Regions:
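Gram-negative bacterial Sec-dependent N-terminal signal peptides
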Residues: 1-22
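An edge-strand/N-cap motif at the start of beta-rich repeat modules
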Residues: 21-39
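Conserved beta-propeller blade signature
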Residues: 24-28, 68-71, 114-117, 167, ...
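A short beta-strand motif characteristic of beta-propeller blades
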Residues: 43-52, 87-97, 136-148, 192-204, ...
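Structural signature of eukaryotic scaffold interfaces centered on beta-propeller domains
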Residues: 58-67, 97-113, 150-168, 205-220, ...
């Protein structure tokens, strides 16, 4: 997701060459408010409350299989959301959902076409959004060989790589608010976590309220992005290091984000 057309010199070097094609990002805040961020202007182009949902939206993501934006609410109801109007249409009702009051991670596995739901309490679910069937996978825990072995995970965001239709392989990365770092969850179904590295966010930013997504070009290239406060950061998937890229006007309290499919196969 090389998404900004104009950056500081250091950020431009980091993010690489830009193209003429902007990308839109859906950013979730409050209970069910979506802001559409235009990556060309670096501003919010429209903001609306999701129309037709009952309850707090846990998280959002684009499903690679159909390129539609999905939202999951607290009672487990799954909706598709029209990004032009904000109108929600019920898709299914999950037979099990996350523990009330926990921070939620919602992201589609592009290979299995299943929705991963993770709670900050360690609950780890895998859902078929077509029929609502849910598999309870292994509770999150750090690997026996990890430096954080025995500690309680506090995952507040996560995303899969290669998030495109027809992907043959993928990997799941999480953000842990307690250690302020990037984790790799492998295998995702087992819930086994391995620390990649510290994000190194500014101390003024609240790592408990962040949004995280990974852009993929369909050719094996992945770029991870994290929103904290009103700053978008690039995240190195090899080291966990988060680097401020640009400040976004008109957003605050963003707790989930989804990179929307654009007219071109590849954003900037």
């Amino acid at each position: 997701m090389k998404i900004w057309t104009t950056l500081t010199a250091s950020a431009a070097v980091l993010l690489g060459a830009v193209s003429a094609q902007a990308v839109e990002v859906a950013a979730l805040s409050g209970d069910n408010t979506i802001s559409i961020v235009n990556t060309d202007t670096k501003k919010v182009t429209k903001t609306w409350k999701i129309d037709g949902v009952s309850g707090r939206v846990l998280g959002i993501d684009v499903r690679p299989a159909d390129s539609m934006l999905y939202a999951v609410v607290t009672d487990g109801t799954v909706y598709t959301v029209d990004t032009a109007t904000g109108k929600a249409t019920m898709k299914s009702k999950l037979e099990k959902t996350l523990t009330a009051g926990t921070a939620a991670t919602v992201d589609f596995n592009p290979v299995a076409d299943r929705l991963r739901l993770i709670g900050s309490d360690g609950m780890n679910l895998r859902a078929n959004v077509d029929d609502g069937k849910v598999t309870v996978d292994g509770t999150l825990k750090f690997a026996e060989t990890d430096m954080h072995k025995g500690e309680k995970p506090n995952v507040v965001a996560g995303a899969y790589t290669n998030s495109v239709k027809g992907a043959k392989e993928t990997a799941l990365y999480d953000i842990d608010a307690t250690i302020g770092g990037l984790l790799k969850q492998a295998p995702p179904n087992d819930g086994v976590l391995g620390a990649v590295g510290k994000l190194g966010l500014d101390a003024k930013l609240d790592v408990k309220i962040v949004a995280f997504d990974i852009w993929s070009d369909g050719q094996g290239k992945n770029e991870a992005w994290l929103m904290a406060g009103d700053w978008l950061h690039s995240v190195d998937l090899a080291t966990g290091k988060a680097t401020p890229a640009v400040q976004i006007n008109g957003v605050s309290g963003i707790r989930d984000m989804a990179i929307l499919p654009g007219p071109a196969a590849k954003p900037m």
